Amino acid sequence: MSLMKEMLSAGVHFGHKKAFWNPQMKEYIFGINHGVHIINLEKTVPLFQDAVNFVGKTVANGGKVLFVGTKRQAQDIIEAEAKRCGMPFVSHRWLGGMLTNYKTVRQSIKRLAQLEKMKEDGTFESLTKKEMLQNIRTIEKLEKVLGGIKEMGGLPDAIVVIDSNKEHIAIQEAQKLGIKVVSIVDTNSNPEGIDYIIPGNDDAVKSISFYMKKFADAVIDAQGLDRAVEAKAEETTEA
């Protein structure tokens, strides 16, 4: 099946009602059907391919890509696909400063690791019931917000975003730090300042699944390429 047909099947072409449109998306809109903007997939296909290739190259070069999608219908997909390809993710809430104040965030990640170790090695058993419950609640709270980035080990090289409106703070932080931004941009969104714009439906579960599966597949392929290059380098060194 061609990429265009896959996109049509996933409903990528369905935008928002005309009343909610952002005029800056005009060049990516094909027309209107029953008051809803239809996205021009002839524009989306090459832009999406460019974005997927960029993500693959970033990972092949040893980079990290952070998947971001905190809206309800994106949460499970973001988490599942990020875990499938071994990339960091944020699927519940974007903490202000998650990138721009990463040093502080890293301290919270360390705290989470310490508490998890205490829970595993039996240290919790020597605490009072109240202290134990407080620590368990802290673990749950930190895990929900930071669980997806606790293995990130530093700032990412790029972020992949579902819904540029909802994740505008994440995008602003990435832009400040010169981190490349790949984003699905619906007809009600502002494409300005996004490095890799993907005009498309950012609400339908089927569309979100389509995007994230393609990105995760690209990461997995790139990881295989990266490992092959490493193995070849090792062979050369040994020789």
UniProtKB/Swiss-Prot annotation:
Give the UniProt record's GO annotations in the biological process aspect: translation
* Keyword Ribonucleoprotein attributed: yes
Q: Which CDD domains match?
A: RPS2
Is Cell inner membrane found in the keyword set? no
Q: Which domain of life is it from?
A: Bacteria
The UniProt entry, under InterPro entries, shows:
Ribosomal_uS2, Ribosomal_uS2_bac/mit/plastid, Ribosomal_uS2_CS, Ribosomal_uS2_flav_dom_sf
An annotated GO cellular component of this protein is: cytosolic small ribosomal subunit
PROSITE patterns (UniProt xref): RIBOSOMAL_S2_1 (PS00962)
Q: Which UniProt keywords apply?
A: Ribonucleoprotein, Ribosomal protein
In terms of SUPFAM superfamilies, this protein maps to: Ribosomal protein S2
Q: Which GO terms describe its molecular function?
A: structural constituent of ribosome
HAMAP family hit by this protein: Ribosomal_uS2_B
Q: Which family does it belong to?
A: Belongs to the universal ribosomal protein uS2 family.
Q: In its UniProt entry, what is this protein called?
A: Small ribosomal subunit protein uS2
Natural source organism: Francisella philomiragia subsp. philomiragia (strain ATCC 25017 / CCUG 19701 / FSC 153 / O#319-036)
> Which gene is the coding source of this polypeptide chain?
rpsB
